[in-house]
């Protein structure tokens, strides 16, 4: 099915939140959406993000940490910024690209429970979007 829409999850380092969002997006939206993630910088996938997603039986070890790709950004049907930094510093998007902000705390460098909490919050938010389109 090539008529898929494209959703692009952005955060600062494409290390934690956007990686989890990409994985949840593929799980909940993969049949209707092409799901990508990127960051203002590429910090590498955080090992705790991998561990947190493994806890819910989602393997993100093969996901890569990428800098924002202008081609994907310019052709995306929906761009979702996941942290205040990416929302304020995100490259300008063309008028036809729908851009929304879903703020989540950055778990990097915090206690393990923060990774679990943020993982679950992102999962619930994307699950809601998959059902309601909001």
Swiss-Prot record:
Gene3D superfamilies: 3.40.50.2300. This is Arsenate reductase. It comes from Bacillus cereus (strain ATCC 14579 / DSM 31 / CCUG 7414 / JCM 2152 / NBRC 15305 / NCIMB 9373 / NCTC 2599 / NRRL B-3711). Transmembrane segments: none annotated. The active site is at residues 11, 83, 90. One of its GO terms (cellular component) is cytoplasm. CDD domains: LMWP_ArsC. Keywords: Arsenical resistance, Cytoplasm, Disulfide bond, Oxidoreductase, Redox-active center. The gene is arsC. It catalyses: arsenate + [thioredoxin]-dithiol + H(+) = arsenite + [thioredoxin]-disulfide + H2O.
